[in-house]
Swiss-Prot record:
PANTHER family assigned to the protein according to its UniProt record, in alphabetical order: GLUCOSE-6-PHOSPHATE ISOMERASE (PTHR11469:SF1)
Function, in words: Catalyzes the reversible isomerization of glucose-6-phosphate to fructose-6-phosphate.
Main localization, broad class: cytoplasm
This protein's record includes keyword Isomerase: yes
Similarity-based family: Belongs to the GPI family.
Catalytic activity: alpha-D-glucose 6-phosphate = beta-D-fructose 6-phosphate
Pathway: Carbohydrate biosynthesis; gluconeogenesis; Carbohydrate degradation; glycolysis; D-glyceraldehyde 3-phosphate and glycerone phosphate from D-glucose: step 2/4
Any Pfam family matching the protein: PGI
Organism whose genome encodes this protein: Malacoplasma penetrans (strain HF-2)
EC number assigned by the record: 5.3.1.9
Protein's UniProt name: Glucose-6-phosphate isomerase
């Protein structure tokens, strides 16, 4: 499902073959530690098992409830309260599969404490009906706790206790935590977050699957793609495992070439939030003990008009990873409305996706040939539920190996607590 292209990386395939050989033994050893669940952070490898060993009854119930919400044409709005992996991965999946406009339902995400944004959304929803999805393992995440108070109380005011709970689903811990307690007290429908799956790996669990189902995605196809990726990446031989090939090249660029930034490039607006997911995935997994590549995401050609100058001729502390989709969800033919008055007559009758792909290949040529930038290309055929699930789990295996190559625990994020503890101390004064 995934094809890697190394044509524009170092000197091409000859270079990558040498690198793969140098990493082969180390990769095999680390792969065994992952598969045998003996690696650093092994207690948080549940995302590897989930696509094939999930609770069948819970997912059946999740699909039934999400389809019921999706089929209710009277309620057009869905509000998702989540932050980090409880937001980014959810949105990445929905945006990956659905067209940007004319969706069956409008979805709004509350993932910050911007008073202006929250006020505007509340004012809109005072006049309209909406469903509410709250996602938090503990229920003590401040951003989500505050948002839940505001939006659940709005439902309560509009529809009463019964109406509010009918329009709400909580995704939280199976047994414990503040949100679990509130959901049980209020008799709110819940689905559980597995104990052994961290936030940035969790979009393939009810964390992401419920909202995806509400928006019309086929949950089973997402899980099918995930399961295939996990199976494909069990292979210990780096020559046969694209996830480990990519992990090895990332580590090589960091440790041997002193490239400390990775720029993720996409040419489709719908893929932007997948690169936001990658930003969190790699930053939280690798950024420890003074180590790690800083992930940066770019939407081309838009960002070529802002950071393009730096990428072409600036401080070359980075390499690029470009993700592309062969077949667009939809396409547009350039009309002959102005004939050649604008000097663009040579584009008459051409498809917009073709023009976009020419821009992509031209940028790759300019960056690699002229700018001497090393570029890894990740190519997929289609945007759909299965390809999203596959790529999501494929990158999860990449980051597991990447973190272990750096000799850090890829599955914790202790540094995130620093701002939280200071924030709570100040707020309680």
């Amino acid at each position: 499902m995934i094809k890697l292209n190394f044509t524009n990386f170092l000197e091409g395939n000859k270079s990558t073959e040498k690198i793969f050989k140098s990493y082969a033994s180390k990769i095999e050893t680390l792969n065994n530690s992952i598969e045998e669940k003996k690696c650093k952070g092994a207690s948080m490898l549940g995302w590897m098992d989930y696509p094939s060993k999930y609770n069948k009854n819970e997912i059946k119930e999740l699909i039934n409830v999400s389809q019921e919400w999706y089929n209710n044409k009277k309620i057009k709005n869905v509000v998702v309260l989540g932050i980090g992996g409880s937001y980014i991965g959810v949105r990445a999946g929905i945006d990956w599969v659905l067209p940007e406009f004319n969706r069956e339902k409008e979805i709004y995400y509350v993932s910050s404490m911007s008073s202006s944004y929250v006020y505007s959304l509340i004012e809109k929803l005072k006049k309209e009906d909406f469903y509410l999805i709250v996602i938090s393992k503990s229920g003590t995440t401040l951003e989500i706790g505050v948002a839940f108070r505001l939006f659940y109380s709005l439902l309560f005011e509009k529809f009463g206790s019964e109406g509010a709970k009918e329009r709400t689903v909580a995704i939280t811990d199976k047994e414990k935590g503040t949100l679990r307690k509130i959901a049980d007290t209020q008799d709110i429908q819940t689905f559980s977050i597995p104990d052994d799956v961290g936030g940035r790996f969790s979009a393939i669990t009810p964390v992401g699957l419920f909202a995806m189902g509400v928006m019309g995605l086929d949950v089973n196809k997402v899980l099918k793609g995930c399961a295939k990726a996990i199976e494909d990446t069990k292979e210990p031989d780096i020559e046969k495992n694209t996830a480990y090939q990519y992990a090895a090249l990332r580590h090589y660029m960091y440790s041997k070439k002193e490239k400390y930034n990775e720029v993720f490039c996409v040419y489709e607006d719908a893929l932007r939030f997948f690169t936001e997911h990658l930003k969190q995935l790699f930053a939280e997994s690798e950024g420890k003990e003074g180590k790690g590549l800083l992930p940066v995401n770019c939407l081309f050609t838009t960002d070529l008009h802002s950071v393009g100058q730096f990428l072409q001729e600036g401080n070359q502390i980075f390499f690029e990873t470009c993700i592309s989709i062969k077949n667009p969800l939809n396409d547009v033919v350039i009309n002959e409305f102005l004939k050649d008055e604008d000097g663009l007559g040579f584009l008459n009758g051409k498809k917009l996706d073709y023009i976009n792909k020419v821009a992509a290949s031209s940028t790759i040529d300019a960056h690699h040939i002229d700018g001497k930038i090393d570029i890894i290309q990740i190519n997929l055929d289609n945007r759909n539920e299965e390809s999203f699930g596959y790529l999501y789990s494929w990158f999860s295996k990449v980051v597991a190996m990447s973190g272990l190559l750096l000799k850090v625990n890829p599955f914790d994020q202790p540094g995130v607590e620093a701002y939280k503890s200071r924030m709570f101390t100040k707020l309680k004064k």
